[in-house]
């Protein structure tokens, strides 16, 4: 699971960035990707995440857009984790591999249709629990595979 890229996309909250990092690094993810961060997420969330990563010997990659992350990282698959109203299929944790990019949307509105075309839209639970809840469940389920 260490090589998997975990991404927080479209966030404006510094606290969300910090908590996302705490959860991902807590599950021993080596590299967190952040795309389309604005407002306090970009101004104070990213620097806080960099500090956390440095102290833990982990990595942070920050891109302006999701397309940039896909271009640079060249993942085998891109999973966009959203809610059931926009994603048709439930996540099959067995289909997620080490060289995949797994993207969680920080905005309460979820992914746009254009963003969903960039990968495989999947949901984890029936109800909307947000990026942090989805991340925690996802990483817990993935950790059971090891």
From Swiss-Prot:
GO biological process, alphabetically ordered: DNA restriction-modification system
The keyword Nuclease appears for this protein = yes
Q: Which InterPro entries match?
A: DUF2122_RecB-nuclease-rel (IPR018665)
Entry's EC annotation: 3.1.21.4
Q: What class of enzyme is it?
A: hydrolase
State the UniProt keywords alphabetically: DNA-binding, Endonuclease, Hydrolase, Nuclease, Restriction system
Q: Which reaction does it catalyse?
A: Endonucleolytic cleavage of DNA to give specific double-stranded fragments with terminal 5'-phosphates
Family affiliation: To A.pernix APE2001.
Q: What job does this protein perform?
A: A putative type II restriction enzyme, its methylase would be M.MjaORF1200P (AC Q58600).
* Protein's name according to its UniProt entry: Putative type II restriction enzyme MjaORF1200P
Give the source lineage, highest ranks first: Archaea, Methanobacteriati, Methanobacteriota, Methanomada group, Methanococci
């Amino acid at each position: 699971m260490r090589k998997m890229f975990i991404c927080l996309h479209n966030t404006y909250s510094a606290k969300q960035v910090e908590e996302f990092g705490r959860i991902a690094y807590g599950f021993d993810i080596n590299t967190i990707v952040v795309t389309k961060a604005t407002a306090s997420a970009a101004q104070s969330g990213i620097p806080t995440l960099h500090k956390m990563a440095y102290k833990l010997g982990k990595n942070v990659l920050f891109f302006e857009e999701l397309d940039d992350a896909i271009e640079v990282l060249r993942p085998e698959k891109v999973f966009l984790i959203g809610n059931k109203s926009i994603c048709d299929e439930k996540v099959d944790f067995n289909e997620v591999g080490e060289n995949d990019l797994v993207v969680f949307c920080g905005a309460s509105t979820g992914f746009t249709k254009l963003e969903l075309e960039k990968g495989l839209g999947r949901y984890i639970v029936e109800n909307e629990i947000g990026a942090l809840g989805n991340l925690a469940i996802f990483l817990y389920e993935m950790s059971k595979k090891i």
